[in-house]
Amino acid sequence: MKFQGVVTPDGLFVDLWGPVSGTRHDNYMLAQSGLMPKLATLISPSGHPYCLYGDPAYGLSNHLVCPFSAASVGPLSPEMADFNKRMSHCRVTVEWGFKEMTGLWAFVNMKPQQKFLLSPVAKQYRVATLLSNWHSCLDGGNEISQYFGVLPPTFEEYLCV
């Protein structure tokens, strides 16, 4: 069983989709999640469309970039290899987000008790994601926000109160 998550440089999950069977391809999850059409409706404050950096399995689109592949473009130039190396450090931060969430909220990491379609796994992950975001706001950040040097909003800002 797996989930797809989007984490911003302030360390907060801004999108979570799943679960799907662990045997499903990542492209299936991306298509089913509706994430790309959502991104197409958003414009950044600079007027440019938002773009995510994702796993190579996702491929390229107007809103998604991935590492250069020697299989696709031939031998990588030094610039391409450098881009891949630097961006791989950014992509791993999503894994840090899931690691933090499952570390803080053990109930989402009890795989033997989680039965796909028989237990409320999706609800548990959504609750854990919300709690993790709250925890990061109340704690002044997390490993991801420290890595990027971007503070999360305050708890009050997050709740818009």
Q: Language-model features: where?
A:
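Short, well-ordered secondary-structure "scaffold" segments embedded in the functional core
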Residues: M1-V161
